[in-house]
Amino acid sequence: MKGKLFLFTVLIFTFVLSGCNFEKKEIYNIATATTGGTYYPIGVGMGQLWTEHYREQNIKFNGQASAGSVENIDLLKNGEADFAILQGLISTQAAEGSGIYEGDQYEELRSVGMIWPNVEHFVLMEDFVESGDISDIAGRSFSVGPQASGTEQSTVTMMEGIELGKSDIRTEYLGYDDTISAMRDGRLNGGSLPAGVPVSAITDMYASGLNAAILEVTDEQIDDINDIVHTWYRYTIEAGSYPRQEEDIDTIAQPNILVTTSDMDEEMVYNLTKILFENREYMIGIHNSAREMQVETALEGLNTPLHAGAYRYFEEQGIEIEAHLKPEELREEEN
């Protein structure tokens, strides 16, 4: 039944899109992150969904692996990617020209919507767990994520909030799967693996019997971290989310945002936004974290102006859109 409904939806959109008349490429790239996290499968699945709807127009959308949010900004700027998934932190800093983008504002960056929360997973070998919160990483060999990645930037920002710097840990720069592999081999004490629940690399960590734990974040630590950049909120990883996880884990999350650029065709972005949010069940089949992808919450935590096409879609859905999310190009049309 679900397959028939999906096919019916595809046929409807194929009919609608066949009437669209705009310049288009044959291949559009969606920048994601390393293969062990959530960005990659979500981006690949999104590309498959969009490709199915644009099949008769011979347009393909490909999810591509990358080092993460920071590299994704570069890929967008260089024209090597047309869409990207970014951490809320990186998207905000790039759009505002703040933080690591101080003096380098990306004025053309546009958001499409929040897809799912990026849940912080600080993991540490049980032998080094003392308080059970993220302060336990002090003095340990700890991967902050690949260099020039959103993981590195969010991890360093969180560390700054609890008054830790890279000099307070033995810093490594590894992807998700490599982090767990290095912990298993005894070469690493822990690492930061932010992603939607469940994270495949952490599922592997628990399922393989690795004696490691996900560290919690205290209320005081949340406040201190948000004093640096206000983008995180409380998130509970419910018991049973991972193998052998018997209790809830109190951590934090920030929004994961689908973005593009202001020069992307408005009609195409409108259609892609509509396709994505109206095929939620399909996306859940790709990765369980997509269960939190909803039109009603799609603008939560966004600080980056919406693309005009996405703005039109959410306006049609009756979603209240805050003034700072209105793109400059729509403001100019009103004047």
Question: What is each PLM-predicted segment?
Answer:
Residues V16-G19:
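C-terminal motif of bacterial Sec signal peptides marking the signal peptidase cleavage site
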Residues K25-H53, I59, V119-D185, E300, ...:
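Bilobed "Venus flytrap"/periplasmic-binding protein-like clamshell domains
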Residues G88-I90, S98-I100, E126, E130, ...:
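Pocket-lining segment of extracytoplasmic ligand-binding domains
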Residues N21-E23:
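Bacterial signal peptide processing site
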Residues E102-I115, E120-H121, S241-D250:
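A structural signal for short loop-to-beta-strand junctions that line the ligand-binding cleft
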Residues E52, Q57, G161, G165-E172, ...:
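Secondary-structure end/capping motifs
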Residues D178, A195-G209, I214-E216, D224-N226, ...:
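An extracytoplasmic/periplasmic, membrane-proximal ligand-sensing/linker region
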Residues P41-K77, Q245-E246, E332:
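Extracytoplasmic small-molecule ligand-binding "clamshell" domains
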